Structures are given as structure tokens and as C-alpha cells.
Amino acid sequence: MIKRVFAIFTLTLLFIFVRPVFSLDTSSKTLEKYTKKISNKFTRTYCNTTKFGISYEGALAFAIGETNKEFKNNKLNKLIDDSLLKNSIINDLENNCQVYDFDISNLENLKFN
């Protein structure tokens, strides 16, 4: 008798306090858009900072800091491909800022975890 009352009480509490779990939309299109958004943010920040006359090292540190700050709390950070992101940044720098000698190893501090 006590076992049944305890079981009913426990099941009632479980059904009352259980929250639904929603899946995270992680389609490849969503990840590509997110990667492009990060790449565009970094590129804009880096280009604008160098145009203001700040040194390349200072512009790099500022762009990495601003990009990390803006995107650090997004749930998609665990799912993005770092090499794809870095290559996208390099391509955007070449196409938008005409920076052709940017080394990919400069982006090692661009981390969101």
C-alpha cells in the first residue's frame, strides 16, 4: 500500500515538473549562415580597425576580442568547424579588404568555448 502511494506521488511529481525538451536546429544551412556571420563580423572589424590607422597586431587583437565577445554564448559554437571558419575569414579578408598576406595561424585565439 505504501509503495503504491509513494509510486503515485513520485509519478505525479515527475509529470508536474518535467519540462519539454526541444531539439536544436542544427542543419548544415544554419551552421553555414552562422559561420558566415562570424566571418563577416571579424572581417568588418579587422578592416575598419586597420583603416583607422591601428597596427595590424592591434587590429587583430581587437577583432578577435570583439568577435569572441559577441559570439561566445551561442549554442552553435560547439558545432562549427574551426578550419572552415578560419578559411572563410581568410577568403573574406582577401575579397573585402585586399589583405593577401594574412596567416591563418593568427586566428588561433579566435575561440568561443
Q: Which role fits each region the language model picked out?
A:
Residues 1-24:
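Classical Sec-dependent N-terminal signal peptides that target proteins to the secretory pathway
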Residues 57-113:
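Compact alpha-helical subdomains of small soluble proteins
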Residues 5, 12, 36, 87-88:
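Alpha-helical interaction segments
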Residues 17, 40-41, 90-91:
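Processing junctions and N-termini across compartments
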Residues 10-13, 23, 30, 59, ...:
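Acidic/proline-rich low-complexity IDRs
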Residues 24-75:
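Short N-proximal segments of mature Sec-exported proteins
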